[in-house]
Regions:
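Short, positively charged and aromatic/hydrophobic N-terminal segments
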Residues: 3-6, 11
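N-terminal nucleotide/polyanion-binding subdomain common to many enzyme families
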Residues: 27, 35, 135-186
Length: 186
């Protein structure tokens, strides 16, 4: 009986993690088309009682990242809270500071990440930093959805080429125009 209760609790916790991560994915999507060359990232900060105390997303390149925006909203309520982030927090200095450092300095107790960042400047270093700071790290929550959200970014980073979408219209017999050359209504 005790094993069932623990198992049930784990399942409920997992469902909660997925619900918060879904919200983070919704936030990230708000920046679609504005973040290049950076990925779309969303972050939700949740206190011990399960209340959302901060939300943020990366609006555009050069501006604060999702984690920093969510921490700014959460303020001191971030202490001991859980951060749900759609992509591994960055670990390098660029136009902004590393998000893994910002999360640690804010006193975040746990970070739940949808997927790892394949960018060689990050590539596991953000999570390693968090673990070294004594922060619990969970990965893979809504991973498939997060990877789909940033297909363009992942293709550029891993394959060194743009993500291409092709639209092709043809007739039922596989042609792109009629015998007369008319392609207006195919």
């Amino acid at each position: 009986m005790r094993f069932f209760i623990l198992l049930e609790g784990d399942i409920l916790a997992r469902m909660t993690d997925e619900a918060y991560m879904q919200r983070a994915l919704e936030l990230a999507l708000q920046a679609e088309g504005n973040t290049s060359p950076n990925p779309m990232v969303g972050c939700v900060i949740v206190d011990a009682e399960g209340n959302i105390v901060g939300e943020g997303y990366h609006h555009k390149a050069g501006e604060p990242h999702a984690e920093v925006n969510a921490l700014a909203e959460a303020k001191q309520m971030a202490q001991g809270a859980t951060a749900y982030v759609t992509l591994e927090p960055c670990a390098h200095y660029g136009r902004t500071g590393p998000c893994c450092v910002a999360l640690a300095r804010a006193g975040i107790g746990k970070v739940v990440v949808a997927c790892l960042d394949p960018n060689p400047k990050v590539a596991g270093q953000g999570l390693e930093y968090l673990r070294l700071q004594g922060i619990e790290v969970v990965t893979g929550v809504c991973e498939k959805e997060a990877k789909r959200l940033n297909e363009r970014f992942f293709t550029w980073i891993t394959k060194q080429r743009p993500f291409i979408t092709l639209k092709y219209a043809m007739t039922l017999d596989g042609k792109i125009a009629t015998a007369t050359g008319d392609s207006k209504w195919i």
